[in-house]
């Protein structure tokens, strides 16, 4: 008689590769969303495990949106950590509401296209663009600050490239635990982020955002094609 199939062990190679490709971007997204790397790792571990549990029921084409949806909705990321810290150029991330910050980070840290980022947050295109506009750094006169945008994008790309070896090893352990079905510690529930009324005055020319996102994408592509990514990391998803 055949032994019953082990539903926890032996995950498909495609699933393992997908999670390996997401872990670096997911860790940076989670850390910058809540302002605390440890709290972010709790959220990432929970999202990895939750995704492992339902990936088999999804077409592979739907995997990215589902993963980022799970991570964005993780309770530890719904509010900033009590001791949240964003340093240097990333201090601009402290001001936006959690939803708006997530909209920005799904593009710059998660590497998602606009439609996928909107789907991950459960927003339509217009609502997503409004969230991005609210997350836009402003100068002293309240105008969109292109230099601050570029600085944030460059700082995020630097953080993605330069995660230290011990951090990468921890992320690999989180992935392996998720693939093995290991449970993660429970986290305290957090309040859902406040919704904001769309203020038409805060909308701004999309050529600015599009240009900066293109620069960030070009920087990420250059990093990859120059072979600077660590051998253990797959192409970020």
Tell where the protein language model's regions lie, with residue ranges.
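A short, charge-rich alpha-helical start-of-domain segment used by transcription regulators
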Residues: 1-28, 38
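Alpha-helix N-cap/N′ positions at the starts of helices
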Residues: 10, 21-25, 84-85, 95-101
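Short amphipathic alpha helix immediately N-terminal
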Residues: 95-120
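DNA-recognition helix of helix-turn-helix
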Residues: 121-151
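C-terminal single-pass membrane-anchor helix
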Residues: 180-237
């Amino acid at each position: 008689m055949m032994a019953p199939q082990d539903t926890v062990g032996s995950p498909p190679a495609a699933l393992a590769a997908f999670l390996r490709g997401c872990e670096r971007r997911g860790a940076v997204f989670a850390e910058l969303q809540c302002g605390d790397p440890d709290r972010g790792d709790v959220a990432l571990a929970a999202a990895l495990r939750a995704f492992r549990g339902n990936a088999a029921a999804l077409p592979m084409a739907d995997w990215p949106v589902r993963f980022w949806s799970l991570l964005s909705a993780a309770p530890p990321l719904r509010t900033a950590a009590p001791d949240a810290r964003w340093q240097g150029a990333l201090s601009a991330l402290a001001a936006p509401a959690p939803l708006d910050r997530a909209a920005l980070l799904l593009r710059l840290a998660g590497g998602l296209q606009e439609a996928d980022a909107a789907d991950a947050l459960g927003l339509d295109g217009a609502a997503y663009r409004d969230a991005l506009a609210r997350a836009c750094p402003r100068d002293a006169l309240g105008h969109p600050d292109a230099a601050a945008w570029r600085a944030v994008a460059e700082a995020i790309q630097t953080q993605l490239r330069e995660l230290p070896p011990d951090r990468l090893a921890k992320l690999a352990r989180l992935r392996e635990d998720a693939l093995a079905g290991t449970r993660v510690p429970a986290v305290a529930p957090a309040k859902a982020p406040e919704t904001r009324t769309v203020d038409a005055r805060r909308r701004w020319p999309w050529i600015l955002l599009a240009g900066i996102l293109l620069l960030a994408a070009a920087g990420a592509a250059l990093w990859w094609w120059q072979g600077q990514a660590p051998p253990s990391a797959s192409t970020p998803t």
